[in-house]
């Protein structure tokens, strides 16, 4: 399955798409956010919205209908809220595409198009949800409106594949041990980011650290930092800054300048120091979250070693009834 042919088939079968809804939960929803950001910014003849799946079901958009494209993701394939969202969308006449890592799971039931993807550190970024999502978004843009950066998107994903191995080594060598040490020293800390990268600011907090490390932390949008949260800044408080290389970098730089003079514990992960600046500027903002996700994986693993806490351990998820 590939994004170009899939989108072409949908348009031929259903006609012009008028709205796109991205639905998932947790890390799977986060994977869809950069694609939504691409469409929010670039699309002029249709709309795009991302939903956590339960909210999509409880507050179903009135615009959901035969001209809608619903793109869902459930890594396990068994997230009931996502399956329910797909069922609701199908009943409304929408075109449904569901992504999953698990063939034969609840979501891979033959009722809609299912894209079963591989998973693992060695997989191409174009073959996993973040990459699949931005490619579907880019193809939809191109086939309905024209998208000059389509070739850059494909090329940029290949560049991400090329730069990630060295980036993983670098972040472990330069930040891994110190990050784990700071987690020992600070029971709570803040993570800042913005733009499409904010998906991974959110992800680092709720997935890599709260879910996988039971680490108390909070995410803050860099653009919102000066509209309330900066009042809590003081010496002894740890801040982790995701410094992107795209259009929103000035927001992070402004926040970082304030942090450097008002607290004594700041760690910066600067995408430009890891080769991300070589990715075409036209698409970099939408691909950079891939970089921050992969670096978060390395940092949570570094913390896990020091705390003897495997990222695979859960105490509630899939164990208790909730």
Which positions does each model-derived feature cover?
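Structural motif
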Residues: 2-6, 55-62, 226-229
């Amino acid at each position: 399955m590939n994004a170009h042919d899939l989108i072409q088939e949908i348009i031929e079968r259903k006609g012009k798409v008028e709205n796109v809804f991205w639905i998932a939960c947790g890390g799977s929803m986060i994977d869809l956010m950069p694609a939504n950001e691409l469409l929010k910014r670039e699309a002029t003849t249709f709309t795009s919205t991302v939903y956590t799946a339960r909210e999509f079901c409880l507050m179903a958009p009135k615009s959901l209908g035969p001209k809608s494209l619903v793109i869902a993701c459930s890594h396990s394939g068994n997230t009931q809220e996502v399956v329910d969202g797909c069922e609701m969308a199908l009943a409304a006449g929408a075109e449904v595409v569901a992504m999953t890592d698990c063939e034969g799971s609840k979501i891979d039931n033959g009722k809609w198009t299912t894209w079963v993807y591989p998973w693992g550190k060695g997989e191409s970024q174009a073959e996993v949800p973040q990459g699949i999502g931005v490619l579907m978004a880019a193809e939809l843009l191109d086939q309905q409106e024209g998208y000059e950066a389509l070739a850059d998107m494909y090329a940029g994903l290949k560049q991400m594949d090329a730069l990630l191995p060295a980036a993983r080594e670098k972040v472990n060598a330069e930040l891994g041990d110190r990050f784990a040490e700071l987690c020992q020293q600070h029971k709570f800390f803040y993570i800042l980011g913005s733009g499409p990268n904010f998906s991974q600011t959110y992800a680092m907090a709720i997935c890599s650290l709260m879910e996988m490390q039971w680490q108390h932390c909070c995410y803050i949008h860099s653009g919102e930092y000066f509209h309330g949260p900066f009042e809590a800044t003081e010496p002894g408080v740890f801040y982790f800054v995701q410094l992107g290389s795209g259009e929103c970098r000035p927001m992070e730089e402004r926040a970082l300048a304030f942090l450097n003079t008002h607290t004594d514990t700041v760690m910066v992960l600067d995408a430009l120091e890891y080769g991300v600046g070589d990715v075409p500027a036209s698409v970099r903002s939408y691909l950079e979250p891939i970089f921050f996700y992969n670096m978060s994986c390395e940092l949570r693993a570094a913390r896990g070693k020091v705390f003897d806490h495997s990222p695979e351990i859960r105490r509630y998820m899939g164990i208790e009834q909730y």
